[in-house]
């Protein structure tokens, strides 16, 4: 007589549908807090529906997607999962605001080998907080449990955001001209870029991430969530014709600022107009990193750069400070000769 074969289930293969359902129940309250009036229906459908907000004459949708890179590795190693969701939202919505777009809705993709409901709930709670800060609705997502694809407690995630801007109000850098002034908005730390180098510095310096650093642990300082600039900038746009914005992410100053400048213009940055936050000095010293490489990899304390007309500089600075931003005069736009570098940093870092 042949042996009876074992009856297999999806759970036997490593996929726990019940855990996925438990996660959905845990995050319903998070999703509800982010709801906008344009959102139609609730979570759980095959697709999410959202109307264009009233008041737009020629609405243009702006979409973006991003992740948080190897900052996740550090978060996983330190078992701190409640802030990387904020990072995920920030990386997307800060890219949208650069073009003048108001973020409307956000979706996330979360993938892991074995779903830990508590960890995933912490991550999604952070995503919800980021959406609240930016006024963006969390309308859906995908949780993928994929045994054999990720080791242990590892996970990865990606975010997808859509915003809207009036066609005549799109900010694309075409108005930038010599004489325009640069404004810096302070970052909260490394944000979500350069973490492969950060982790290398931690390795070669044998640094203790639990050691005190400026009143926090070193690990907490490095994992400080990316600052979200959406609401203050949307308010500024109502009063000032901002000519360009640059989100200082991977590639630092050298690569991000030229993305929003016409070929005939260059940004002259006053390198002594601000003090690098201590974490960047620590990274440079412990990694023996050149100043050029620092500006190429990290934001060095500047999370966003604005280009405004010269006669709007003081008004812009005053408004941004009133709105809670640490803002300062960073430099100016000058004419660039053919083939000339489009970013010049004058004066050393403090």
UniProtKB/Swiss-Prot annotation:
Family as reported in the entry's similarity comment: Belongs to the AIR synthase family.
Documented EC number(s): 6.3.3.1
Protein's pathway: Purine metabolism; IMP biosynthesis via de novo pathway; 5-amino-1-(5-phospho-D-ribosyl)imidazole from N(2)-formyl-N(1)-(5-phospho-D-ribosyl)glycinamide: step 2/2
Catalytic activity: 2-formamido-N(1)-(5-O-phospho-beta-D-ribosyl)acetamidine + ATP = 5-amino-1-(5-phospho-beta-D-ribosyl)imidazole + ADP + phosphate + H(+)
Entries under Gene3D superfamilies matching the protein: PurM-like C-terminal domain, PurM-like, N-terminal domain
Annotated source species: Pseudoalteromonas translucida (strain TAC 125)
GO biological process, one term: 'de novo' IMP biosynthetic process
Protein name: Phosphoribosylformylglycinamidine cyclo-ligase
GO CC terms in record: cytosol
Highest taxon above the source species: Bacteria
